[in-house]
Swiss-Prot record:
Membrane topology term: Peripheral membrane protein
Protein name per UniProt: Segment polarity protein dishevelled homolog DVL-1
Biased composition (Polar residues): 600-611
Organism in which the protein naturally occurs: Pan troglodytes (Chimpanzee)
UniProt domain DEP: residue ranges: 400-474
Length: 670
């Protein structure tokens, strides 16, 4: 004979009840179910049954027609009996019973009409805990009594909108009364204060059964008080987040025939506050999700194909995803969109940014460097092509609204500031620079950017890879900050040139140049003294000229051989034995050979004075012994290089090269 199993839940009781009806599952009705529950006040309950809806899936359906057939799942019926609002029984039996004759009522944690299954309330215990000395008849009687008391209490709480103290005064009972009314008032409150806990503990009874029940009820209320406060705090949080993060549910169907993998990583976010769910952690390039573009990191994964991901652990979600991807056919992902995880246009909270001290000098230099940048309209007017200057392409690439994602990235637990991915650079070049017929040409262009120093790898790799992180090179980022005084203060990095001589002194430039120099500027005072002149022995001039040559050898390798010759010439300046001097070609100047006698004859007065009185300035009449060859028109007389004292030859040669070849002299900073 066919029979039907009906599993029903009574309010928030943890353990469900099971009854069997001698009726086929497809023929069982609500009237058959109520006949089995004849010992319960079925007229005071609403009947909800587990049912399947085409739009929402599994739901709880209320059935009130006695002739309606009950929905059946796997040969059984699942039902919930919820106390109806306004239902109450005879109130006279409540006032006549003493408090010690009744067991404690059930502890209610949900509101009226709460149709959640009992699994949502794991801390609720049965009302008959610790009452093993009752008989079956006493249990049934006390069960009916507590039902009546609870219905009366809830009716009074709903119809009376006054606080607990007002209701107590309306009843006319003192605060320490041990009557049923006071007990119901305490149990119906959401938060039990310490004084009410004390009054509850002072309610004594002659039976051990009632005392143990009171202790259990008091313990439950304390736990319930803490849990409700946590729920209140969480509800205040949700009221804030719901107003700012409204969800938008999107269903995305992916064609897995064009892509080899799904390309997502999922993260489980379960915690004590119940904020559970499976979230999209990251999206990998080349996958089906990245190609679609509608799913972003931070979205909540609700359903994949027909599998619901709610209340699913992270391991189960990974297993289900792998099984679905291994199958053929399209995949449908249902996600709840969240707000932008990386907002750019509205408020942001820089939680991950470190706090750095402010350097005023660096801030000023950075501001000054920005003032020398190219105007925006010049960059926007001229479109970028493959023939454009690489520096201009890189400058446009670094603009905030260029479309290239430049941000801090993590690599091997190292933060790389303002880094880009090689694949993004290639895509940006292929999209924004004209002249590339295919993408691999843009990749070659990106490789040339790395080769010329516009891009720089973290570990200085010279080969370009689309999977690596790159930063912009110092050549394009620090070019605006360069100036002529940016060298170090060491003597080996600077040219030590003697200042211009006194206007009354002979002009040091010879007639070897095809053009004439103007006279010295009138800014020098009449009493100007040349501190670069060496009045000591010949070795002093050699040291000074030697210092002036060292910077040239370090700054430009092309002038190293000429400077080495100058150093040798300066070292032998005291003897006057060297007469062959060379200069760089291409500037129109010539150096003429002079006999050794001319050098020794021109330098003999200064050499004798230096030998007789080292470290003392010679008398001025000695300057008249120089041979005057000629000078620029309107300027002082000019003497030949051979007439210059040997200890000053090296410094004067360096000065002549600087004045005669200015382009070569400043070629180091280009």
């Amino acid at each position: 004979m066919a029979e039907t199993k009906i599993i029903y839940h009574m309010d928030e009781e943890e353990t469900p009840y099971l009854v069997k009806l001698p009726v086929a599952p497809e023929r069982v009705t609500l009237a058959d179910f109520k006949n089995v529950l004849s010992n319960r006040p079925v007229h005071a309950y609403k009947f909800f049954f587990k049912s399947m809806d085409q739009d929402f899936g599994v739901v709880k359906e209320e059935i009130f027609d006695d002739n309606a057939k009950l929905p059946c799942f796997n040969g059984r019926v699942v039902s919930w009996l919820v106390l109806a609002e306004g239902a109450h029984s005879d109130a006279g039996s409540q006032g006549t019973d003493s408090h010690t004759d009744l067991p404690p009522p059930l502890e209610r944690t949900g509101g009226i009409g709460d149709s959640r299954p009992p699994s949502f309330h794991p801390n609720v215990a049965s009302s008959r805990d610790g009452m093993d000395n009752e008989t079956g008849t006493e249990s049934m009687v006390s069960h009916r009594r507590e039902r009546a008391r609870r219905r009366n209490r809830e009716e009074a709480a709903r119809t009376n909108g006054h606080p607990r103290g007002d209701r107590r005064r309306d009843v006319g009972l003192p605060p320490d009364s041990a009557s049923t009314a006071l007990s119901s008032e305490l149990e119906s409150s959401s938060f039990v204060d310490s004084d009410e806990d004390g009054s509850t503990s002072r309610l004594s009874s002659s039976t051990e059964q009632s005392t143990s029940s009171r202790l259990i009820r008091k313990h439950k209320r304390r736990r319930r008080k803490q849990r409700l406060r946590q729920a209140d705090r969480a509800s205040s949080f949700s009221s804030i987040t719901d107003s700012t993060m409204s969800l938008n549910i999107v269903t995305v169907t992916l064609n897995m025939e064009r892509h080899h993998f799904l390309g997502i990583s999922i993260v489980g976010q379960s915690n004590d506050r119940g904020d559970g769910g499976i979230y999209i952690g990251s999206i990998m390039k080349g996958g089906a999700v990245a190609a679609d573009g509608r799913i972003e990191p931070g979205d909540m994964l609700l359903q994949v194909n027909d599998v619901n991901f709610e209340n699913m652990s992270n391991d189960d979600a990974v297993r289900v995803l792998r099984e679905i991807v291994s199958q053929t056919g399209p995949i449908s992902l249902t996600v709840a969109k969240c707000w932008d995880p990386t907002p750019r246009s509205y408020f942001t909270v820089p939680r991950a940014d470190p706090v750095r001290p402010i350097d005023p000098a660096a801030w000023l230099s950075h501001t000054a460097a920005l003032t020398g940048a190219l105007p925006r309209y010049e960059l926007e007017e001229a479109p970028l092509t493959v023939k454009s200057d690489m520096s201009a392409v890189v400058r446009v690439m670094q603009l905030p609204d260029s479309g290239l994602e430049i941000r801090d990235r993590m690599w091997l637990k190292i933060t790389i500031a303002n880094a880009v991915i090689g694949a993004d650079v290639v895509d940006w070049l292929y999209t924004h620079v004209e002249g590339f017929k295919e993408r691999r040409e843009a990749r070659k262009y990106a490789s040339s950017l790395l080769k010329h120093g516009f891009l720089r790898h973290t570990v200085n790799k010279i080969t370009f890879s689309e999977q690596c992180y790159y930063v912009f090179g110092d050549l394009c980022s620090n070019l605006a900050t360069l100036n002529l005084n940016s060298g170090s203060s060491g003597a080996s990095d600077q040219d030590t040139l003697a200042p211009l001589p006194h206007p009354a002194a002979p002009w040091p430039l010879g007639q070897g140049y095809p053009y004439q120099y103007p006279g010295p500027p009138p800014c020098f005072p009449p009493a100007y003294q040349d501190p670069g002149f060496s009045y000591g022995s010949g070795s002093t001039g050699s040291q000074q000229s030697e210092g002036s040559k060292s910077s040239g050898s370090t700054r430009s390798s092309r002038r190293a051989p000429g400077r080495e010759k100058e150093r040798r010439a300066a070292g032998a300046g005291g003897s006057g034995s060297e007469s062959d001097h060379t200069a760089p070609s291409g500037v129109g100047s010539s150096w003429r050979e002079r006999p050794a006698g001319q050098l020794s004859r021109g330098s003999s007065p200064r050499s004798q004075a230096s030998a007789t009185a080292p470290g003392l300035p010679p008398p001025h009449p000695t300057t008249k012994a120089y041979t005057v060859v000629g000078g620029p028109p309107g300027g002082p007389p000019v003497r030949e290089l051979a007439a210059v004292p040997p200890e000053l030859t090296g410094s004067r040669q360096s000065f002549q090269k600087a004045m005669g070849n200015p382009c070569e002299f400043f070629v180091d900073i280009m």
